[in-house]
């Protein structure tokens, strides 16, 4: 990792601590295991987390549309099973966190804390029983949409983004508030994001998004939504995707 980080960079990240609010590495781990490689967390990801000073990483489980609708939950289970198996195999260096107290303890022990997230609510199906079950497994963050329209709301890539949060989406927000699962609006349409912020009694976040005022892109947030997230007690995680930063 020397080509990316200097010694000064490493010392700075060690002192301030880095929280990676969104990382898609569970998909890479699942693919590697399908290919017969069972140690990619240790061999590839952990060295990068260490080099970058990452103390907390949100592991985002994403289900491709080819698994919709019937196999969406099955794919999410595959991803979670693969991820948790590799975390368990590397328990001296990385550990699943279920609470703030867990994160603090894990970091004090010099380990990386992992929080589980679901990117897109398709694995939940048409009711909230899977949400409750996934919470028991450690789910602590959830995006109700990923780009497209779901049963729960409208994504940010829909050409017709009218409709916002649906009735089951509102029930999901209420249940997430009750369980302690954070709502992530990163891939929600403007209307859906506003509806979530109005419906949620708990802090709302955008785990990976930038300011639309600086780069006019549907994945970025309006000033109105950014201010509402801040007012809720939530945060916005900046994302270093070139097209979300500049047209150049």
Residue positions per predicted region:
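N-terminal hydrophobic targeting/anchoring segments and the immediately downstream early-domain regions
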Residues: 1-161, 216-248
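Active-site core of metal-dependent hydrolases
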Residues: 144-225, 237-244
């Amino acid at each position: 990792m020397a080509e990316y980080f200097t010694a000064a960079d490493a010392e700075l990240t060690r002192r301030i601590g880095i929280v990676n609010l969104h990382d898609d590495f569970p998909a890479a781990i699942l693919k590697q295991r399908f290919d017969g490689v069972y140690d990619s967390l240790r061999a590839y990801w952990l060295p990068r987390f260490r080099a970058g000073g990452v103390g907390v990483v949100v592991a985002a489980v994403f289900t491709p549309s080819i698994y919709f609708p019937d196999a969406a939950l099955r794919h999410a289970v595959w991803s979670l099973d693969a991820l948790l198996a590799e975390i368990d195999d590397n328990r001296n260096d990385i550990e699943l966190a279920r609470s703030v107290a867990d994160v603090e303890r894990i970091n004090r022990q010099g380990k990386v804390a992992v929080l589980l997230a679901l990117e897109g609510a398709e694995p939940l199906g048409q009711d909230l029983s899977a949400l409750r079950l996934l919470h028991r497994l450690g789910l602590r963050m959830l995006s109700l949409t990923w780009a497209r329209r779901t049963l729960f709301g409208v994504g940010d890539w829909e050409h017709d983004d009218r409709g916002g949060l649906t009735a089951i989406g509102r029930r999901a927000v209420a249940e997430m508030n009750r369980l302690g699962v954070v709502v992530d609006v990163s891939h929600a349409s403007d209307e859906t994001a506003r509806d979530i912020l109005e419906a949620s009694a708990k802090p709302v976040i955008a785990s990976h998004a930038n300011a639309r005022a600086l780069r006019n892109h549907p994945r970025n947030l309006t000033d109105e939504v950014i201010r509402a997230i801040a007012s809720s007690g939530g945060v916005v995680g900046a994302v270093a995707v070139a097209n979300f930063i500049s047209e150049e």
